Regions:
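Short beta-strand
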Residues: 35, 197, 272-276, 300-302, ...
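Conserved core of the PLP fold type I
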Residues: 57-164, 175-191, 195, 317
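N-terminal small-domain helix-loop-helix segment of the aminotransferase-like
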Residues: 2-91, 96
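Structural preference for solvent-exposed beta-strand-turn elements
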Residues: 179, 328-523
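Conserved PLP-binding catalytic core of the aspartate aminotransferase-like
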Residues: 256, 263-296, 307-313
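PLP-dependent enzyme catalytic core of the Aspartate aminotransferase-like
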Residues: 155, 301, 305-331
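PLP-dependent aminotransferase class I/II
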Residues: 193-273
C-alpha cells in the first residue's frame, strides 16, 4: 500500500496544546489554564429544539438534502435555498471548494497571514498556491481576516471577482456577524464566481456541532453539491442549527464593545493592534509573547507575526491584559473572575450576575455540579466553574473551596453593592420536599442553615458537608443567608435548597435604585 505523495514541505494543521499539556509543561494544574485561542464565545449557544426528540432518532441517517437547514440559512442570508450548500463547518466547505475548483496543474491565490486551512486544502488537491491572483483558478479571501481581524469592503471583493472572472473567489465570512453584517452575499447576482462561506461556530456558539453553509449562484452551488459528502452533518446538529438560523439569539454588541475595550488597553501601553472586526484582537510582535503567557497558563494563538487573543468574559480578558502589562479600564456589567490554588484544590470561576442562566460546572463531584447548576440557573447567573481537588482523600476540601470561591465571586461582582434590591426570599416545593431561602446582601456575614437529611450521602456527595459549605459561601460573600429544607427524599431536599437560594439571590441582586437600601443611612 502506498499513500499519494504530498507536496514537499507540506504542513498539516496544528492545534494549540491541550490544557493538560500546558499544565504539565509549566508545572500547573489544568484548572489553572485559561484559553484565548479558539475564537469561540465563552459560553455556548442555547439549543432551541427539544434535544430528547433529536436523540431519540440517533439510529436514523439525517435527511439527505438538509432542506430545513438550507431553507433556514437561505432566509437568514437573503438568498434562495438552491443557492445554499451545507457542510460540517466552514472547514468542510473549504475542502469542498478546493475539490471543486482545484487539482494538479491548477493554482490558488491567497494573502497571508490568513487561515492556514486554505493552504492545506489547496495542497491536498495537488494544486499550487501563490500570492498573485492573476491566472488563479481559485482565490481565497478571509473577510474579516483571521488572524489579523481586518475587513475588506464587500464592494472591493466583488471588484476582485469581476477582475478575475476565470477564478472562483471564495470568501470566508466566519466572523461577519462581528463586522456589522458586512457581507458579500447580496453581490452573488452581479459576481456569479463568488462563493460565500459561513459557520455557526462563532457568533452562534455551536462550534462542537460542526455546521457551516456556502452561498453561491445556483449553478455554482450545484457543482459544490455534487462534491460534498452524502450526510456531513449529524441530524441533531442540523435541527439545532436550523432553529438557530430561524431565530438568532446571539448579541454581538457586548462582544464588540469588549473588543474595543481590550484593544484600547493594549494600544495604551504601546502594542501594535490593528482595528479588528472579529471576536479577537491581533497583536503584531516579534517578541515571544505567546510563550510568556503560556508559562502563566494563558493560551493564545501564536504566529510568526504576532499573537491572536480570543475575547472571553471581561473579567477574564483583564487577566491576559494584566499579564501583558496593560491596565484595563473598568469592565462592563457585574462580573467576577476568581482563581485559587492550594495544596488541596485548584479552581477558576467566572461569574456574570446579569446573565441568562448559562452554566458550566465541573468539580469532579457530579451531584455538587448538579446543585451549583440549579443555583446559578435559578439566579439567572452565567457561571463557569472548573475545579480539581484531592478527591482521592475525600470531597471535603473541594466542596468547601468551591462554595467559598462562589462567595468570593459574588462579593467581587457586587462591588459597592449600590443600586441592588438587597433582599430576596423564596419558597420552593420539590415534590414532597420544601425549602425556603432568604438573603440580605448588606455586609453582615451570617448564615443559618437547616437541611434535614435522613442519610449521609447522595450521588457520591457527603450531605453533611453542605451546611458548612453554604456557611462559607455566606461568609465569603459577606452577606446574610438563611436556608431551610426538609422532606423524605434527600435528593429533593438538597435540590430544593439550592433552587430556593438561587431564586432569593436573583431577587436580591436585581437593580433596586440608587445607593444601598438601608434605613440606617449607611450599610
Amino acid at each position: 500500500m502506498k499513500a499519494r505523495a504530498l507536496p514537499d514541505g507540506f504542513a498539516a494543521y496544528v492545534w494549540a496544546p491541550s490544557s493538560a499539556e500546558v499544565a504539565e509543561r509549566h508545572g500547573l494544574r489544568p484548572e489553572q489554564v485559561l484559553r484565548y485561542d479558539q475564537n469561540t464565545p465563552p459560553v455556548p449557544g442555547v439549543p432551541q429544539v427539544p434535544l430528547a426528540e433529536s436523540f431519540a432518532r440517533l439510529n436514523e441517517y439525517p435527511e439527505g438534502t438538509y432542506r430545513e437547514l438550507r431553507e433556514a440559512a437561505a432566509a437568514y442570508s437573503g438568498v434562495e435555498p438552491e443557492q445554499v450548500v451545507v457542510g460540517a463547518g466552514a472547514d468542510d466547505l473549504i475542502a469542498t471548494c478546493a475539490r471543486t475548483f482545484l487539482g494538479p496543474g491548477r493554482r490558488a491565490a491567497w494573502n497571508p497571514p490568513t487561515y492556514a486551512l486554505y493552504r492545506i486544502a489547496t495542497h491536498l488537491e495537488g494544486a499550487e498556491l501563490a500570492v498573485e491572483p492573476d491566472g488563479a483558478d481559485l482565490i481565497w479571501v478571509c473577510n474579516p481576516n483571521n488572524p489579523t481581524g481586518e475587513l475588506v469592503a464587500p464592494e472591493e471583493v466583488a471588484a476582485l471577482a469581476r477582475a478575475h472572472p476565470q477564478a472562483a473567489v471564495v470568501v470566508d465570512e466566519a466572523y461577519f456577524e462581528y463586522a456589522g453584517g458586512a457581507t458579500c452575499a447580496p453581490l452573488l447576482a452581479e459576481a456569479p464566481n463568488l462563493v460565500v462561506l459561513r459557520t455557526l461556530s462563532k457568533a452562534f456558539g455551536f462550534a462542537s456541532l460542526r455546521v457551516g453553509y456556502a452561498l453561491a449562484a445556483p449553478e455554482v452551488a450545484a457543482h459544490l453539491e455534487l462534491r460534498r459528502a452524502p450526510a456531513p452533518i449529524a441530524g441533531p446538529a442540523a435541527r439545532i442549527a436550523a432553529a438557530a438560523l430561524r431565530e438568532p439569539r446571539f448579541d454581538v454588541a457586548g462582544d464588540v464593545a469588549e473588543r474595543d475595550r481590550v484593544r484600547d488597553a493594549l494600544l495604551g501601553v504601546g502594542y501594535d493592534c490593528p482595528a479588528t472586526f472579529t471576536n479577537f484582537v491581533w497583536v503584531r510582535s516579534d517578541e515571544p509573547l505567546g510563550e510568556r503567557l503560556e508559562e502563566q497558563g494563558l493560551v493564545v494563538r501564536r504566529f510568526a507575526e504576532g499573537i491572536r487573543i480570543t475575547l472571553r468574559r471581561p473579567t477574564e480578558n483583564d487577566v491576559v491584559l494584566r499579564a501583558l502589562g496593560a491596565e484595563p479600564g473598568p469592565p462592563p456589567g457585574r462580573g467576577a473572575y476568581v482563581a485559587r490554588t492550594t495544596t488541596e484544590t485548584a479552581l477558576r470561576l467566572s461569574l456574570d450576575l446579569d446573565g441568562s442562566g448559562r452554566v458550566r460546572v465541573a468539580t469532579g463531584i457530579g451531584f455538587l455540579d448538579h446543585l451549583l447548576t440549579l443555583l446559578a440557573f435559578h439566579a439567572a447567573f452565567d457561571l463557569e466553574l472548573v475545579a480539581g481537588g484531592d478527591l482521592d482523600v475525600d470531597e471535603h476540601h473541594t466542596v468547601e473551596d468551591v462554595l467559598a470561591a462562589l462567595g468570593d465571586g459574588l462579593a467581587q461582582a457586587l462591588g459597592a453593592r449600590e443600586g441592588v434590591a438587597r433582599y430576596g426570599s423564596a419558597t420552593v416545593p420539590m415534590d414532597e420536599a420544601r425549602a425556603t431561602a432568604a438573603v440580605d446582601l448588606v455586609r453582615r456575614p451570617h448564615a443559618e442553615i437547616a437541611l434535614a437529611f435522613g442519610s449521609d450521602r447522595v450521588g457520591g456527595l457527603a450531605l453533611t458537608l453542605l451546611p458548612h459549605a453554604l456557611e462559607r459561601f455566606a461568609m465569603q460573600a459577606c452577606c446574610t443567608v438563611h436556608v431551610e429544607s426538609a422532606g423524605r427524599d434527600d435528593h429533593h431536599v438538597a435540590e430544593a435548597a439550592f433552587k430556593a437560594l438561587g431564586q432569593a439571590l436573583r431577587q436580591a441582586v436585581a437593580p433596586g435604585g440608587a445607593g444601598v437600601r438601608s434605613t440606617k443611612g449607611e450599610a
